[in-house]
Amino acid sequence: MLRKIKVTFIINDEEEKTVEAPIGLSILEIAHSNNLDLEGACEGSLACATCHVMLEEEFYNKLKKPTEAEEDMLDLAFGLTDTSRLGCQIILTEELDGIKVRLPSATRNINYNGFKK
């Protein structure tokens, strides 16, 4: 049986949804499997910034540093913060048990020329 950890998604800065998620999946995959509004227009291929999320510093510091390709995509993200990452690049490990993931209030999808709210 796959080991699971707790992941809490913070939606619109007020609503929280905590789910149990298997280790080895990405934040983007977990959001989609729980019907949360995290776009992921490129389906996790690191070609957009629509799965941009913000983390608490404690969990941000537990992740490997973002690759140059991820940093380039993050530059396009709406509402970028010092603890922003792409959900497709955050793979769950035991060390991330209890992680809180803040979903942005909007995304910028350059394929559609504008913002999604």
UniProtKB/Swiss-Prot annotation:
InterPro entries: 2Fe-2S_ferredoxin-like_sf (IPR036010), 2Fe-2S_ferredoxin-type (IPR001041), Adrenodoxin-like (IPR001055), Adrenodoxin_Fe-S_BS (IPR018298), Beta-grasp_dom_sf (IPR012675)
Keyword terms of this UniProt record: 2Fe-2S, Electron transport, Iron, Iron-sulfur, Metal-binding, Transport
Highest taxon of source: Bacteria
Cofactor(s) of this protein: [2Fe-2S] cluster
UniProt-annotated binding residues for [2Fe-2S] cluster: 42, 48, 51, 88
Xref: Gene3D superfamilies: 3.10.20.30
Family statement drawn from the similarity comment of this UniProt entry: Belongs to the adrenodoxin/putidaredoxin family.
Protein name in UniProt: 2Fe-2S ferredoxin
Species this protein is from: Rickettsia typhi (strain ATCC VR-144 / Wilmington)
Gene it is expressed from: fdxB
